[in-house]
Amino acid sequence: LAGVTIVDPQTTWIEPTVTLEADSVVHPFTLLRGETTVAEGAQVGPHAVVVDAEIGAAAIVGPFCYVRPGTVLGARAKAGTFVELKNTRLDEDAKVPHLSYFGDAEVGAGTNVGAGSITANLDHRPGVPKKRTVIGRNARVAVDTMFVAPVTVGDDVWTAAATVVTEDVPDNALVGFPPRQTI
């Protein structure tokens, strides 16, 4: 643990299988489990849970974040406050800053995801595997965007607030603008 900062060791749980690199910081009430790796300069917590995941150099796992098995955060990626990631890859400089769920997804480099955005990938039929969502590089995902997997969204795509993406979107597209309904 040379060069690692554990802000409050009494409230932090780190299993012996976890790897922490120099200059990483673990904030209070954080749980690191399994084959988790936290790279140089990364920060985790407070109140975060990371299980069997890779946290890249200078990446941030924010407060109350749950990072589940199979997740990889690239260099300088951010999984912010109240974010859950499962089997998801955030490439370098990708950000999911707050209040989002991304499962079985890939988020390209430089992409920013607005609050309340999710991937919907569960098929309740027995034996049906979960589907993936792929979002390209430098996309701008507005608040409350839902991706219904399987779906692929290209590079430099923008979504409007409250958009439901149910089919593939080409590069450089603007998608959304659901009609207003008064009931």
Q: Language-model segments: which ranges?
A:
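Extended, small-residue-rich solenoid/repeat segments and analogous flexible loops
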Residues: 1-60
